[in-house]
Amino acid sequence: MELQKLHYSVAEGIATITMDYGKNLNAIDDQMADELIFCIGEAEKDPEVKVILLNSAAKAFSAGGDIGFFYKLVKAGGEINMDSLIGKVGKITNGMKSSKKMIVAAVNGAAVGAGFPLALSADFIIADEKAMFILAFVNLGLVPDTGAAYLLCKSIGEKRTMKYAATGKPIKADEALALGLVEKVVPPEELAAESLKLAKKFVAGPLVSYTNIKKQIYAASFSDYERFLDDVENPTQHECSNTEDFKEGCAAFMEKRKAAFQGK
């Protein structure tokens, strides 16, 4: 597959996947999703790869969904169907959680919308001091998708997840550390070195043990993840994406103003 928005390399047992769609701050569209699925799959089946490192070459980790694309769908009229893209990103997060290999995410700047669960699907997150995690879906009149509600509930519980999902309140780096979402917070200039250091630690560790630890934790905590994505998340997001509030949320975002929701 010819990569347009990612870079993929393997060295010293580490597969590095670098998102590099800087113009749109690594917004996740169909092309980006397809490339992530491909690269994670390549790393998973490569016996030379012991650890996966996910990072960004842009000024943010990921801006989430491409709202400009959504706005074009809104303006075109008719039923809006984001099931395919949401399904692809759900496949990415589920693939990361069920991977046999340890995954480290280096989060710089904002991880917004779908970018949040993308980071959260890694086994360990190293964040820089400017990192910010935001469930921004509600600001568009949507619900969390790509596994965000599920993954965050598993990590910090129902009440805290409700707080961030219903308000869109950012979780800053120091708060993410206190909540146990990230392993370490470092200055921006140290992020690359610290995340690579952790990845190398796992390369030199008991790999069979790591694989089976992941298998146990996935079975204990995430065995119903696919059912949640298919039976709960996709239908609720489909309903929300065909409301007047979603149209208004997209328009407000593009016009850089506060949304005037009507509750319908």
Language model features: what each stretch is:
Residues 124, 163, 167-169, 175, ...:
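Well-ordered beta-strand positions
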